[in-house]
Swiss-Prot record:
UniProt xrefs under SUPFAM superfamilies: Glucocorticoid receptor-like (DNA-binding domain) (SSF57716)
Pfam family, any one: Ribosomal_S14
Record keywords: Chloroplast, Plastid, Ribonucleoprotein, Ribosomal protein, RNA-binding, rRNA-binding
InterPro entries per UniProt: Ribosomal_uS14, Ribosomal_uS14_bac/plastid, Ribosomal_uS14_CS
Subunit and partners: Part of the 30S ribosomal subunit.
Name by which UniProt lists this protein: Small ribosomal subunit protein uS14c
Subcellular compartments: Plastid, Chloroplast
GO aspect biological process, one term: translation
Protein family according to the UniProt entry: Belongs to the universal ribosomal protein uS14 family.
Name of encoding gene: rps14
Length: 100
């Protein structure tokens, strides 16, 4: 299990991402449309004034059962350990162990 504080930090980042996503996208689109260098520099400084945690890159995909941050399958939201456990116990519908 991951520490509760680490999981909570990720949740807080998700809230910030949702809060500032429209503002961040508007600035990015303006940067793409602008050809003047001075204007682009000022727009980049506007992006840098936004909170760091409002960037999507800082969000970590975590297992919804254990909170593990590494080796998480996006389609299921599970770490490899929980995926194997749940699939072998038949808790994931449609997942079948392959054999050939």
């Amino acid at each position: 299990m991951a520490k509760k504080s680490v999981i909570q930090r990720n949740i807080n980042r998700l809230k910030l991402i949702n809060k500032y996503s429209a503002q961040r996208e508007a600035i990015k689109n303006e940067i793409k449309r602008t050809s003047k260098v001075e204007k682009k520099i000022s727009l980049y400084s506007n992006i840098s004034r936004l909170p760091r945690d409002s960037s999507k890159v800082r969000l970590r995909s975590r297992c919804w059962v254990t909170g593990r941050g590494r080796s998480v399958y996006k389609n299921f939201g599970l770490s490899r350990h929980m995926f194997r456990f749940m699939a072998s116990n038949g808790l994931l519908p449609g997942v079948v162990k392959s054999s050939w």
